[in-house]
UniProtKB/Swiss-Prot annotation:
Residues the entry annotates as binding a ubiquinone: 186
Stated name of the protein: Succinate dehydrogenase iron-sulfur subunit
Source species of the chain: Rickettsia typhi (strain ATCC VR-144 / Wilmington)
EC identifiers of the protein: 1.3.5.1
Domain 4Fe-4S ferredoxin-type stretches: 161-191
Length: 261
């Protein structure tokens, strides 16, 4: 009988407890995943007590307060603080989302924060996005048109053609959807995942691009595209309210149409 075991250093252990140093008006406990590969130790869950009466309304505000006032070694990405850049994507209360737009008041009980799942962790809440960006590069996410552009203007679109990009161009590549997808967990070495496939369709749907056939051929692969099993986690978790599953379905339909199906 085959017996499978996780490496001993993959077990998450209880970490440090940072208790309140003074009385708080609105005390709240924040549990944060901590891991530093350079230390060659197990990841831990550290606990911090903070006063929400002296903290901003979003989970990112709580993390910044912890880093500034309690533990400066806590590591996470952040930038815009308004749901535009995608830097602060992480798993909060069991759901992949952006810390900067996740209200603390929406979370009952302790605030539990982990890095995006099924990605190598650089440190603490920082995932390694290298493979994700390599996959993004593979779809050639730029306008491809062999015809010269008009000399005195941009390549124009009709209002109707421009509207076809709504729900696609807004993707901020935060990877919340891809890292919520079981198919991506299992086959991320070959399956492009919902974020990249939505981005691929964004260029396929662009009327200014004349490389549609080649783009579809590049995706016609048992793993790149067809590992999508319509689980729909991607659509449920997208912090921008987009529908990657719909975009993937449209790519599949276009490929079928090319084969006369």
């Amino acid at each position: 009988m085959v017996e499978l075991r996780l490496p001993s250093n993959s077990v998450v252990k209880k970490g440090r407890v940072h208790k309140a140093q003074q009385e708080m008006l609105k005390p709240r406990k924040v549990q944060v995943y901590r891991y530093d590969p350079d230390l060659n130790k197990n990841p831990t869950i550290d606990s911090f007590e903070i006063d929400l009466s002296k903290t901003g309304p979003m989970v990112l505000d709580a993390l910044i307060k912890i880093k500034n006032e309690i533990d400066s070694t806590l590591t996470f990405r952040r930038s815009c603080r308004e749901g535009i850049c995608g830097s602060c994507a992480m798993n909060i209360d069991g759901t992949n989302t952006l810390a900067c737009i996740k209200p603390i008041e929406d979370i009952s009980g302790d605030i539990k924060i982990y890095p995006l799942p099924h990605m190598k962790v650089v440190k603490d809440l920082v995932p390694d996005m290298s493979h994700f960006y390599t996959q993004y590069e593979s779809i050639e996410p730029w306008l491809k048109n062999d015809n010269p552009a008009p000399s005195n203007s941009e390549r124009l679109q009709s209002i109707q053609d421009r509207e076809k990009l709504d729900g696609l161009y807004e993707c901020i590549l935060c990877a919340c959807c891809s890292t919520s997808c079981p198919s991506y967990w299992w086959n991320s070495d070959k399956y492009l995942g919902p974020a990249i496939l939505l981005q691929a369709y964004r260029w396929i749907a662009d009327s200014r691009d004349d490389n549609t056939g080649a783009r579809l051929e590049a995706l016609e692969d048992p793993f790149k595209l067809y590992r999508c099993h319509t689980i729909m986690n991607c659509t449920k978790t997208c912090p921008k309210g987009l529908n990657p599953a719909k975009a993937i379905g449209r790519v599949k339909s276009l490929i079928a149409e090319r084969h006369g199906v």
